[in-house]
Amino acid sequence: MKETIISDIHCIITKPDRHNLITVVVETNEGVTGFGCATFQQRPLAVKTMVDEYLKPILIGKNANNIEDLWQMMMVNAYWRNGPVINNAISGVDMALWDIKAKLAGMPLHQLFGGKSRDAIPVYTHATSDTMEGIYDLVEGFLEKGYKHIRCQLGFYGGVPTDLHTTQNPTEGSYYDQDQYMDNTLTMFKSLREKYGNQFHILHDVHERLFPNQAIQFAKEVEQYKPYFIEDILPPNQTEWLDNIRSQSSVSLGLGELFNNPEEWKSLIANRRIDFIRCHVSQIGGITPALKLGHLCQNFGVRIAWHCPPDMTPIGAAVNTHLNVHLHNAAIQEHVEYNGNTHKVFPNAAEPINGYLYASEIAGIGVEIDREAAAEFPVMYRPHEWTQSRLPDGAIHTP
């Protein structure tokens, strides 16, 4: 097979909407260019530096066809490995290499994987509001569009706090009360079931906001409303408590968006402590490890629901769709509809049709970046207040 030599690599950071989005561009001597998602929006410049200063020098002149070898080299070259900055940087290159290979083969990415196991993947979207009336309005609109799975949140993560009993001169941060959050969320579930019955599946993201004993209680009480799954009921460093939850509740659990290292998910899958793996594909290093993870999950009856939030390029979202139509144990894909600027920067970005996402049939990933349009929306960074989550006494808590 003729070698395809990597001739250049660079990063593009753009902010067409609320989030800084990072795209890696890999060029070859064959004139075929690949694009990959490397978005770590809280540390965009760190990822760009990793790509431009550390990965590019070891990749120029290498054969782009040897994806597995290049992935392994990128992962171990710094000796220290499996962190969010390096994994996202590797992901951007890895996705771009798969994009190149599929373009050279003249087939869409899912066909390169081995073809489809389904026609399309069901989608869930987000209905978030500070009031139940606001949630109802959003739900009505999504039902009209054909969605059958909706993640419902009363307020931002941690809920809508009222009458917080804080300290004098409290430390700056985003405050919430765990008991209020649990009570309000259970009331939300009850109200949605009373109003809509089983017209749609309800999902909910705890987003690590509870202590383990509270998570057990919440899982027991929310079970009666039959959520499709409860996401991130515990942080990654408390997953041994999942056995306690499993022994007291049959509620379906999704976990994994913060995972970087295979050691974080292997025992959860092998011991069937979760129902859905929620890894963020760029956060674990791209397509190469995602395919392996998907196959591992299938052996243990764990289904796939990749993390696919707005702070991901449409390139990364398209990769998720290709993975989902290929992997037999894929269950659902998260999606928040794009604004006009995002469609301008990323032509062919897919939107759901009647509650389903369809994989592109264009050779490669099927979504690229318009570099001129991207330049209209330069990177902007500010510290994120929502990740400075605090309890009423001022103690910081996992966001």
From Swiss-Prot:
Keywords: Magnesium, Metal-binding. Pfam families: MR_MLE_C (PF13378), MR_MLE_N (PF02746). GO terms for molecular function: magnesium ion binding. GO terms for biological process: amino acid catabolic process. Homotetramer. Belongs to the mandelate racemase/muconate lactonizing enzyme family. GalD subfamily. This is D-galactonate dehydratase family member VSWAT3_13707. It comes from Vibrionales bacterium (strain SWAT-3).
